[in-house]
Amino acid sequence: MANVRRHMQVDHRANLETAALAVGESLALAWAHFHLLRGLDNGRLQHPAIVTRFDLLYDRLWRAAFDAFFAKVGTLLDNKKGSDSLLRFLVLARRYASLEVKNVLPEIEVELSNQDAPLAKLKRWRHEVVAHKPTAHDAVGFHTQNRMTLTEIESALEQLDDYFNQISWNMLGLHSEHRSAFAGIVCQAELLFATTALGLATEPE
């Protein structure tokens, strides 16, 4: 692959690097919002009394992190022309790649278009619950068909990250680590819950 990258036209590489930077930033922020959701959920499980005491605050924090996460997922999966999405990055890769590199792209394209895959569920959540909220939306039916745990969401995000790095490595020789950049949010959220619980426990009657 090194030979393929060496002979890429300068302007093509520049276009790919610009797209990779934009997609990478969205991936990192998606991970940041996911880690916040995970931290809030862990805090809820470890200290349920805190959620009972501050129920409205917890609900709003969760909703804000939820909406922010799916906004970034929407950016990553947007198929509109000119968007800074993983799909746009894939289009550029197909346009500029040699035949050898193009052989690794169809599998990614198939998975991204698979309507039964976890990624399709993420896309539907963003479209029907966070972004557009169609008037004919059936909340009960939608939640039954598209229910996802945080672990399933995490797996889908890992898949997006993996697809990005497959393209980036084959086209640019670059591998990026997005997940760990904001991983400390989980521990910090847990610590916040624990500290608050301790403070409540020592409150005078």
Question: Could you say what each language-model-derived stretch is?
Answer:
Residues M1-P118, H143-E205:
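Amphipathic alpha-helical interface segments
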Residues L112-V140:
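Histidine-centered, metal-coordinating catalytic motifs and their short helical/loop contexts
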